[in-house]
Amino acid sequence: MQSIILFIPALIANSGAVITGGHFIIDRGKKFIDGRRILGNGKTLSGYAGGIAIGTVTGFIIYLISTLFNYALGTYGTLAEAIIIPFIMATGSLTGDIAGSFVKRRIGIDRGGKGGLLDQWPFALMAFLFLYIFERPFFMYHYFYVTMIVILVIVPPIHRAVNIIGYKMHKKDVPW
């Protein structure tokens, strides 16, 4: 359970991107060699930076709460790691989301189109990959095998629920 709580910054980063997004489209309207948009209007620098910031702050808040409750929620380690590790997870998460959008455009799924696991897993997988590359001891301790699989199983229903909430708040055009 602690490892799932410590993964929250990767999950929150995507919601943070929706809330802070809308400015400075990453692909600037350009098309890939296949004639389709590289990413689409939904991927913006303001969302990328804002999502990373919100994910990082969320991780720091988890650190503060866990310290207050004597590490009952788990810990990232030191104060510096409480900033660095959530930053890595949030950056990986949003990079994975962008990669998923790139793949969706290549296979002909437009912005807002249902992508199934392409909407749900790339952000989690890339967050894991970034942790493995940049914070391997933390990754190996918290996310090796079973916990990683559990997170990949719970991500789709959580992702769906959050998207429905975003849709009802008029932050998303579609509820998926």
Curated annotation (Swiss-Prot):
GO cellular component, one term: plasma membrane
Cofactor(s) of this protein: Mg(2+)
Presence of keyword Signal: no
GO molecular function, a single term: CDP-2,3-bis-(O-geranylgeranyl)-sn-glycerol synthase activity
Subcellular location: Cell membrane
Keywords carried by this UniProt record: Cell membrane, Lipid biosynthesis, Lipid metabolism, Magnesium, Membrane, Phospholipid biosynthesis, Phospholipid metabolism, Transferase, Transmembrane, Transmembrane helix
Record field: catalytic activity: 2,3-bis-O-(geranylgeranyl)-sn-glycerol 1-phosphate + CTP + H(+) = CDP-2,3-bis-O-(geranylgeranyl)-sn-glycerol + diphosphate
GO biological process: glycerophospholipid biosynthetic process
Metabolic or biological pathway: Membrane lipid metabolism; glycerophospholipid metabolism
Listed EC numbers: 2.7.7.67
Main subcellular location of this protein, as a coarse class: membrane
Membrane topology note: Multi-pass membrane protein
InterPro entries noted in UniProt: CarS, CarS_archaea
Similarity comment: family membership: Belongs to the CDP-archaeol synthase family.
Function: Catalyzes the formation of CDP-2,3-bis-(O-geranylgeranyl)-sn-glycerol (CDP-archaeol) from 2,3-bis-(O-geranylgeranyl)-sn-glycerol 1-phosphate (DGGGP) and CTP. This reaction is the third ether-bond-formation step in the biosynthesis of archaeal membrane lipids.
Protein name: CDP-archaeol synthase
Organism: Thermoplasma acidophilum (strain ATCC 25905 / DSM 1728 / JCM 9062 / NBRC 15155 / AMRC-C165)
